[in-house]
């Protein structure tokens, strides 16, 4: 008997859809990894009101431009997701932004979560989520 193999790709969280592109956390992770950054923290928020994704990065030491990173990420996501590429080409989905967080931002966010009862060793966040569901205003850390 040859039973079909099923590969589990994604749970319900970590998927965002602003204009029909259905972007997966795994696609974003691959795109971010291609940048070869020394990341301390990364958070990507889907802003449905502005029709764009905003990436927040805390870097260990690099002096890079958020605009340059946004350009490269956009290219990688267009290669990884045909619907993303089509929505970008039609300008239904606006160009993503990369905002660089101040040093120590991750620690402040993590300590706040721990102060609200989350266990320090178990703290983690979903990389890709909707802005309106994220508990912090990351613009305060830019």
Task: Give the location of each predicted region.
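AMP-binding adenylation
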Residues: 1-142
